[in-house]
């Protein structure tokens, strides 16, 4: 009974969420787009001509936003390159190169290199999150693993002057993640966008300029 009530409350909040309504109106696949939008508007992350990788891209709202920011002249197309990576499938988005699979696997990396053609990435964005169990220690370990994967990806594929934006949770293990970012990046910024739900502990970390690029 309690679970049904919880589900009904979530559904009510979701339906009446202004960001859900705005996403539907503006044609975005998820309300999460407004978290990236706010961070981008304050930090000026996305610029014409950039190569941008979206880790954990599905369902695609972040890639949609990046695509809109990089859209070119009236003739169509974009001024830049967008690559979405996810283990789950994603409906196609115009001008977005989507690769389904685990980016630790050689086959996926080969597909990535076919798109990059030796070029380095300007910006890596990640809305990846683990499946939460409710056990703080286990959930923190899963979150740290994802952050480590994102950092390792930037070390191998991003320009030294590039930036990494990741989602994490302000709880067990968060201080470790912040210190990890400070070890890896010259500038670290913590962001809590207005679109993050009040009850959510999610917070975004932005690292700018690698300290020790490979």
From Swiss-Prot:
S-adenosyl-L-methionine binds at residues 60, 62, 86, 102, 127. InterPro entries: RNA_methyltr_RlmE, RNA_MeTrfase_FtsJ_dom, rRNA-MeTfrase_E, SAM-dependent_MTases_sf. It catalyses: uridine(2552) in 23S rRNA + S-adenosyl-L-methionine = 2'-O-methyluridine(2552) in 23S rRNA + S-adenosyl-L-homocysteine + H(+). Disulfide bonds: none annotated. Its EC number is 2.1.1.166. Specifically methylates the uridine in position 2552 of 23S rRNA at the 2'-O position of the ribose in the fully assembled 50S ribosomal subunit. Belongs to the class I-like SAM-binding methyltransferase superfamily. RNA methyltransferase RlmE family. This is Ribosomal RNA large subunit methyltransferase E. It comes from Janthinobacterium sp. (strain Marseille) (Minibacterium massiliensis). The gene is rlmE.
């Amino acid at each position: 009974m309690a679970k049904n009530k919880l589900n009904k409350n979530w559904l009510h909040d979701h339906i009446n969420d202004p960001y859900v309504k705005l996403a539907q109106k503006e044609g975005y696949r998820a309300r999460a787009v407004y978290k990236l939008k706010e961070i981008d508007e304050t930090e000026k992350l996305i610029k014409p001509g950039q190569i941008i990788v979206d880790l954990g891209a599905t369902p695609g709202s972040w890639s949609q936003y990046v695509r809109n920011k990089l859209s070119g002249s009236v003739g169509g197309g974009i001024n830049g390159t967008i690559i979405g990576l996810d283990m789950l499938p994603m409906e196609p988005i115009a001008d977005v190169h989507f690769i389904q699979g685990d980016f630790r696997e050689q086959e996926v990396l080969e597909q990535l290199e076919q798109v990059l053609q030796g070029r380095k990435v300007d910006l890596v964005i990640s809305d990846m999150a683990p499946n939460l169990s409710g056990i703080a220690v286990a959930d923190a370990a899963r979150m740290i693993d994802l952050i480590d994967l994102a950092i390792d990806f930037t070390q191998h594929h991003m320009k030294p002057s590039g930036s990494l934006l990741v989602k994490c949770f302000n709880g067990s293990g968060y201080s470790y993640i912040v210190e990890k970012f400070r070890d890896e990046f010259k500038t670290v910024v913590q962001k809590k966008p207005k679109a993050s739900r009040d009850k959510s502990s999610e917070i975004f970390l932005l690292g700018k300029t690698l300290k020790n690029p490979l």
